[in-house]
Amino acid sequence: MCGRYARTQGADDIFSAFDLQSNEVDHSLPLNWNIAPTNEIYIIRGQRSLATASWGLIAPWMSDIAAARASQSHAINARSESIHEKPTFRHAFRTSRCLIPATGYYEWATSLGKFAPKQPFYISRVDQRQLSIAGIWSSWQSEKGQVIQSAAIITREAVGELATIHSRMPVFMARTKWDEWLDPS
């Protein structure tokens, strides 16, 4: 499970790295080595447009803002194997996919591997270039009309050396698949 991640590149760097076409962001987010659930994050959606969302997908049936916010920390990750079935995630998976730019992510060792439990690891590319993590997003509206954009990271079974640390890992999206992923039609 990816419960924390880092984004050490700003909006301009993301714009360039992802060949973005438009910008929906009206303010810059600070660089952050410790992005936690419910923090505001950058997402790339639609025709490669930069937007912000709160990390943790708000379930569509939430009726008030307090319940919506409380539900977010339980929906930061969506399993790739069941995303199309789970009520919290299935609509967003069918209609609202995104990429989540990151520099790296943190994983805490479990008893699966050769490392002591709860030993943190920072996982990134050797060349420190951006990671593009597959995600989903949604737009939730309260009874009073407040709109909150939220997003979740898609995870899969860990492979290779990562499987010695934890059983899950984010789904990384190859550059050649970005447009196909962002257009679920």
Would you name each region that the model predicts?
Residues M1-S185:
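Short linear sequence motif anchored by a di-proline
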